Design a protein with these regions (language model features):
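A solvent-exposed, acidic/Ser-Thr-rich amphipathic alpha-helical stretch
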Residues: 27-72
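Short, aromatic-enriched amphipathic alpha-helices that serve as compact interaction elements
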Residues: 1-18
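Soluble or luminal CAZymes and related metallo-dependent hydrolases
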Residues: 2, 52, 91
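Hydrophobic pocket/interface hotspot
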Residues: 10, 22-23, 30, 49, ...
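A beta-strand edge to alpha-helix "cap/lid" segment located at domain peripheries
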Residues: 55-113
Length: 113
């Protein structure tokens, strides 16, 4: 799988609220580092491992009662996507960047700003 395809699947999982499919995009030891939460006064989220990613999104989608509203998705290039996401009613501009994929096309590290 190429990076652009992985980004498209990431956005689809975020929009549908599918924590299992989202976690399946990550390597067993994959890292998700999200500093976009600072924009709404929350701490940076750093997750290591596919299981941690799945559990966190299961929790987030549950508390949110479904997927996070995402709009205005723009692919900046094959490794980065920009979008607006609503965190509890607050609209935030976010960039998600895949820093590295493994040999199987799974995410080794994704940074969200």
């Amino acid at each position: 799988m190429n990076t652009r395809t992985v980004l498209e699947k990431y956005i689809a999982c975020m929009q549908s609220g599918d924590n299992v499919a989202l976690a399946d995009l990550f390597d067993k030891h994959g890292v998700l580092h999200d500093s976009s939460l600072i924009k709404i006064g929350r701490d940076t989220m750093h997750l290591e491992g596919k299981m941690a990613i799945e559990m966190m999104f299961h929790n987030k989608f549950g508390f949110n009662r479904g997927a996070f509203p995402i709009s205005a998705v723009k692919y900046r290039n094959d490794t980065a996507v920009w979008y607006f996401i609503s965190y509890g009613g607050q609209l935030v501009s976010v960039s998600a960047v895949i820093e590295e994929l493994n040999e199987e096309g799974l995410i080794k590290r994704m940074n969200i700003y």
